[in-house]
């Protein structure tokens, strides 16, 4: 155990992103992890406790609760659930919560603030597309940048979750892939085209996301002000289904929808931003993370830094590929 450990507090610790960050940091004896949650008795909270995290109940809308939760923290990672039922159009909004988190973290003396952010869809599309979640997160990012009490602020924008392909309930939204074959016996992945060169960024939350964020905390001054493209691999939808077919032996194909506007959300409000995402990337020529093309070199460097800090061999210091991810999660189908 090192003589000095640094406390990282995670807001949203029981979610996908926050949980991934917690599990990565808990592997490094240089860090202590405080996991904030509304329900300390939940299975996700108890799992983190079993790994060595301090579990702390906290209410994001209560300033005193947040201030106490952030007390003594060297760093903070924040991911806000944009679909939180507590948000209302007239307030409180995600931005209201984000401002309070930033203010209380700064007041508590936090030195290094990392936020899961997103670009402004309205700015990228000249007002043609407005993704509510992205707009809120981008406003919070700007608010955090303007807070001069932090030593560093850095940001990460998560790509398309590969883990979504493990959720059978999601498959019908995308033609049934990778679980339900169509009438022609194909596992068909159906969605709008991405746009531009059709280079789609994907992230494995369980394999890479937490390590990328840990890399930011390992050298926070180097990454001060940066927005990291949180992705494991970048490839086309056609390449994705080809990898799946080659790995599993099952027939698979990509069938693009003619228009992003025809993507069926089945009346689920939370899926509206998914539909608008395709409108964003088609309007911007494939841009998703901001005004610059998607890249994974930065994520790869952060992954290497974390792997080296954990003493892992070189063959475990790389981001997982989509092909490797399918090999890990989908068995070969016998002939």
Swiss-Prot record:
Binding site for NADP(+): 12-17, 38-42, 59-60, 80-82, 137, 161-164
InterPro entries attached to this UniProt entry: NAD(P)-bd_dom_sf, NmrA-like, NmrA-like_oxidored
Record has NADP as a keyword: yes
Biotechnology: Hancockiamide D displays potent cytotoxic activity against murine myeloma NS-1 cells, suggesting a potential antitumour application. More interestingly, hancockiamide C, the likely end metabolite of the hkm pathway, shows potent Arabidopsis thaliana seed anti-germination activity, but is inactive against the monocot Eragrostis tef seed, suggesting that it could be a herbicidal lead targeting monocots. The herbicidal activity of hancockiamide C could be due to its phenylpropanoid-like structural features, which may act on the plant lignan pathways, and hence warrants further investigations.
EC number(s) per entry: 1.-.-.-
Molecular function (Gene Ontology), one example: oxidoreductase activity
GO cellular component: nucleus
Group of enzyme by EC: oxidoreductase
Top-level taxon of the source organism: Eukaryota
CDD domains xrefs: NmrA_like_SDR_a
Membrane-traversing stretches: none
Keywords assigned by UniProt, alphabetized: NADP, Oxidoreductase
Pathway(s) it belongs to: Secondary metabolite biosynthesis
Coiled-coil annotated spans: none
Keyword Ligase: no
Family to which this protein belongs: Belongs to the NmrA-type oxidoreductase family.
Functional note: NmrA-like family domain-containing oxidoreductase; part of the gene cluster that mediates the biosynthesis of hancockiamides, an unusual new family of N-cinnamoylated piperazines. The NRPS hkm10 and the NmrA-like reductase hkm9 are proposed to convert two molecules of L-Phe to the intermediary piperazine called xenocockiamide A. Xenocockiamide A is then converted to hancockiamide D via a series of hydroxylations and O-methylations.
Protein name as it appears in the record: NmrA-like family domain-containing oxidoreductase hkm9
The organism's taxonomic lineage, starting at the top: Eukaryota, Fungi, Dikarya, Ascomycota, Pezizomycotina
């Amino acid at each position: 155990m090192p003589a000095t450990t640094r406390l990282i507090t995670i807001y949203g610790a029981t979610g996908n992103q926050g949980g991934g960050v917690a599990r990565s940091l808990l592997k490094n004896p240089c860090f202590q992890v405080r996991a904030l949650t509304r329900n300390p008795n939940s299975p996700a909270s108890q799992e983190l406790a079993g790994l060595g995290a301090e579990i702390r109940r906290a209410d994001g809308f209560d300033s005193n609760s947040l201030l106490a939760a952030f007390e003594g923290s060297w760093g903070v990672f924040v991911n806000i659930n944009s679909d939180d039922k507590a948000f209302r159009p007239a307030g409180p909004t995600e931005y209201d919560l984000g401002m309070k988190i930033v203010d209380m973290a700064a007041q508590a003396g936090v030195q290094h603030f990392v936020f899961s952010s997103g670009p402004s869809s309205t700015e990228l599309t000249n007002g043609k597309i407005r993704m509510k979640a992205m707009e809120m997160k981008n406003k919070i990012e700007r608010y955090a940048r303007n807070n001069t009490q932090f030593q560093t602020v850095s940001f990460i924008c998560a790509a398309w979750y590969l883990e979504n392909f493990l959720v059978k309930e999601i498959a019908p939204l995308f033609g049934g892939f990778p679980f339900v074959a169509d009438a022609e016996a194909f596992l068909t992945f159906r969605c709008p085209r991405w746009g531009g060169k059709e280079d789609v960024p994907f992230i494995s939350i369980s394999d890479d996301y937490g390590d990328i964020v840990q890399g930011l905390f390992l050298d926070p001054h180097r990454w001060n002000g940066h927005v990291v493209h949180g992705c494991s691999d970048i490839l086309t939808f056609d390449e994705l289904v080809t990898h799946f077919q080659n790995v599993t032996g099952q027939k698979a194909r990509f069938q693009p929808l003619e228009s992003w506007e025809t993507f069926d959300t089945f009346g689920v409000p939370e899926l509206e931003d998914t539909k608008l995402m395709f409108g964003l990337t088609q309007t911007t020529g494939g841009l998703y993370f901001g005004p610059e093309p998607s890249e994974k070199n930065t994520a790869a460097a952060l992954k290497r830094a974390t792997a080296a800090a954990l003493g892992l061999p070189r063959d475990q210091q790389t981001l997982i590929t989509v092909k490797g991810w399918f090999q890990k999660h989908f068995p070969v189908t016998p002939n």
